[in-house]
Design a protein with these regions (language model features):
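Secretory pathway targeting signatures of secreted, lumenal, and periplasmic proteins
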Residues: 1-60
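Short, well-structured beta-strand
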Residues: 60-63, 67-160
Length: 160
């Protein structure tokens, strides 16, 4: 079984300390980080826990928000070995200019479907690329996709 905390803690600090965070909620806000992590029921067939991870990444001064949004699609394919993007399309609801990327990959023997929503958020001083990435086993996708959409549609990121 995946130990999400052991993956996130070295990179972002304690995973349980991410609830109710905003891009500007701590002294490391310009560096970005984990805003929220949600875990679902483990898929016993693959011993895999589905997750939704919301990240804030600062956009460098020499990069426009539009460039960051476009480049984030390429980064997704580069960051996940074997990732095959199936869709990269505008997300029809708020936030404005959001993109939805979906794809698949194999992790060991586990077939995974990933959905990533990406959009730009400003805290008034800095621009951030926000990504909400849902991962689940491909067989579980048909059972979980409505729950994931409900969570994504209810998310609200506020400045701290």
């Amino acid at each position: 079984q995946e130990d999400i905390a052991s993956i996130l803690d070295p990179a972002f600090g304690r995973a349980d300390a991410t609830q109710n965070r905003t891009p500007g909620s701590d002294q490391h806000s310009v560096a970005g980080g984990v805003i929220a992590l949600a875990v679902g029921p483990t898929d016993a067939n693959y011993d895999f826990t589905p997750t939704i991870l919301l990240l804030a990444s600062p956009i460098p001064a020499d990069t426009t928000p539009e460039q960051a949004l476009t480049e984030s699609a390429v980064a997704l394919s580069d960051q996940v070995p074997g990732f095959r993007m199936l869709d990269d399309c505008p997300w029809p609801t708020t936030p404005e200019s959001a993109q939805l990327r979906t794809g698949i990959y194999i992790q060991g023997r586990v077939p995974i479907t990933a959905c990533r929503w990406a959009w730009i958020h400003s805290d008034g001083t800095n621009d951030f690329l926000l990504t909400a990435t849902a991962t689940m086993t491909t067989p579980a996708f048909s059972n979980l996709n409505e729950d994931v959409l409900a969570i994504i549609m209810s998310m609200e990121v506020r400045n701290g």
